[in-house]
Amino acid sequence: MNKDNTVFVGNKPVMNYVLAVVTQFSNGATEVIIKARGKAISRAVDTGEIALNRFLEGVRKKEIITSTEEIETDSGKTNVSSIEIVLTNVPL
């Protein structure tokens, strides 16, 4: 898996990330990973669903990975949820 095929979801509008995913597949990628942490997780899920249902034919969800990351803040360590959604256009 090439790191260039990873879309990191943040606070921008969802369609920006959808365009990034569609562009990766248009450029010949066989897999694209959508990653997000914390409050951006719902935006990542929206990105994957919009890309699959409205723009990409023959692409499917390969894997969804959820985890918890421990990050250092000013007030100490805190846990942040994260998600990785792997999309692929390789047939089953």
UniProtKB/Swiss-Prot annotation:
Q: Which InterPro entries match?
A: Alba-like_dom_sf (IPR036882), DNA/RNA-bd_Alba (IPR013795), DNA/RNA-bd_Alba-like (IPR002775)
Which keywords, in A-to-Z order, does the entry hold? Chromosome, Cytoplasm, DNA condensation, DNA-binding
A Gene Ontology cellular component where this protein is annotated is: chromosome
GO biological process terms, alphabetically, are: chromosome condensation
Alphabetically, the GO molecular function entries are: double-stranded DNA binding; RNA binding
Main subcellular localisation: cytoplasm
Where in the cell does this protein reside? Cytoplasm; Chromosome
Q: Which Pfam families match?
A: Alba
What the record says about family reads: Belongs to the histone-like Alba family.
Summary of the function given for this chain in its UniProt record: Binds double-stranded DNA tightly but without sequence specificity. Involved in DNA compaction.
State the name under which the record lists this protein: DNA/RNA-binding protein Alba
Organism, by scientific name, is: Methanosphaerula palustris (strain ATCC BAA-1556 / DSM 19958 / E1-9c)
Q: What is the lineage of its organism?
A: Archaea, Methanobacteriati, Methanobacteriota, Stenosarchaea group, Methanomicrobia
